[in-house]
Swiss-Prot record:
GO terms for molecular function: mRNA binding; structural constituent of ribosome. The gene is RPL35A. Keywords: Coiled coil, Cytoplasm, Ribonucleoprotein, Ribosomal protein. It comes from the Eukaryota. One of its GO terms (biological process) is translation. It is found in: Cytoplasm. This is Large ribosomal subunit protein uL29A. Signal peptide: none annotated. Belongs to the universal ribosomal protein uL29 family. It holds the Pfam family Ribosomal_L29. It comes from Encephalitozoon cuniculi (strain GB-M1) (Microsporidian parasite). HAMAP family: Ribosomal_uL29.
C-alpha cells in the first residue's frame, strides 16, 4: 500500500527512520515470498518506492534543521551541502567586491586621467 509523503512529513525524524526500517523488513520478506510466487506484481515496486519516499522526507527534514541551525552564517562557513549549487567556474570566480577593488596605482591613474566623454549633436 502506498505511503503518502504528506503523511511522512508530519512525523519526526526518529519515527521516519523507524518506518523506513519497517519498510526494509517488509521488502526483505516480499523478496523471499517472490520465490514461492505469493507476491503480486507491484508489491515489491510499491515497497521500494515507499522506502525511497521515506528516506527522501527524512533527508528533507535533516536539511531543514541544518538550515535553521546555520541561519545568518556566511556562505564560506556553511557545510557544502547547504552552499549554493554552482558549476566549478562560478565557484572559483571572484566575488563582486574582489572585482571592484583597485590598486593604489589604478586609483591614481583614474583620478589623474578621468574618462573623457565626447558629445556629438547634429
Amino acid at each position: 500500500m502506498k505511503i503518502e509523503a504528506s503523511a511522512l512529513r508530519q512525523l519526526g525524524i526518529k519515527q521516519i527512520e523507524e518506518r523506513a526500517a519497517e519498510i526494509k523488513a517488509d521488502l526483505a520478506a516480499l523478496r523471499q515470498k517472490k520465490n514461492s510466487g505469493d507476491v503480486g506484481a507491484n508489491d515489491i515496486k510499491t515497497a521500494k518506492k515507499n522506502l525511497a519516499r521515506a528516506l527522501t522526507v527524512r533527508r528533507e527534514k535533516i536539511l531543514e534543521e541544518l538550515v535553521e541551525a546555520y541561519r545568518g552564517t556566511p556562505v564560506s562557513k556553511l557545510p557544502k551541502e547547504l552552499r549554493p549549487k554552482l558549476n566549478r567556474s562560478k565557484r572559483r570566480a571572484l566575488t563582486k567586491t574582489q572585482l571592484r577593488r583597485k590598486t593604489r596605482r589604478q586609483r591614481a591613474r583614474m583620478s589623474k586621467f578621468p574618462r573623457v566623454i565626447f558629445a556629438y549633436n547634429e
